[in-house]
């Protein structure tokens, strides 16, 4: 069903509806280590994504502001109520061993049931490839999960864990605005790749947002 839905749509990003879900928010800050706070980092990245997507004609919906932290079920309701084309959840991780590091992307799937989101898996792979091609974050691969956010959203949904704040190198990267710009560009190019036909595709890590504009991908 998802494959058919995406194959008949225009490759243009204009008028697509993309929901961005930055984790935590408000008084609930999430992970915090090495001077970096999860809720602040992911919201800043969400805003960078939002600005770039709006410039490409996308309708963007954020599930929270800087000052609130909706329940997960409310975030899911937001995504479903706006008839989203895609949902992107942003998170960072932490672990007791500071050597843990890297980026991982999750999509809906249950290996025990043989069920997977076809578009979600493809999108997760595209995001993972683009981020790892443009940054030096360790590639922790893509994984199928049956978390509520992935399972209950109608649109293809991915969650990106963008590094470990408990790891000094990852935290230092994420604290840098230029690095967050790299992440934003990688995600946006991955979004466009999802709608490109195979003959229009380009080598991973080579497309830039300006290339998308020149190609007329905003109607």
Specify the residue positions occupied by each region the protein language model found.
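Catalytic-site microenvironment of enzymes
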Residues: 1-219
């Amino acid at each position: 069903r998802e494959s058919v839905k995406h194959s008949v749509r225009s490759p243009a990003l204009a008028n697509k509806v993309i929901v961005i879900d930055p984790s935590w928010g408000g008084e609930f800050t999430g992970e915090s280590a090495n001077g970096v706070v999860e809720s602040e980092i992911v919201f800043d990245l969400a805003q960078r994504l939002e600005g770039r997507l709006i410039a490409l004609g996308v309708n963007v919906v954020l599930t929270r502001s800087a000052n609130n932290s909706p329940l997960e079920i409310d975030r899911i309701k937001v995504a479903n109520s706006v008839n989203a084309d895609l949902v992107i959840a942003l998170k960072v991780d932490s672990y007791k061993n500071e050597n843990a590091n890297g980026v991982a992307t999750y999509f809906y799937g249950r290996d025990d049931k043989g069920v997977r989101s076809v578009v979600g898996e493809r999108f997760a792979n595209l995001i993972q490839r683009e981020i790892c091609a443009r940054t030096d974050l360790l590639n922790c691969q893509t994984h199928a999960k049956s978390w509520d956010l992935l399972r209950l959203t109608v649109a293809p949904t991915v969650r990106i864990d963008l590094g470990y704040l408990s790891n000094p190198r990852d935290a230092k990267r994420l604290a840098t605005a230029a690095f967050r710009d790299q992440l934003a560009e990688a995600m946006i190019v991955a979004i466009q790749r999802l709608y490109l036909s195979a003959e229009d595709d380009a080598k991973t890590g080579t497309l830039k947002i300006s290339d998308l504009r020149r190609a007329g991908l905003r109607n």
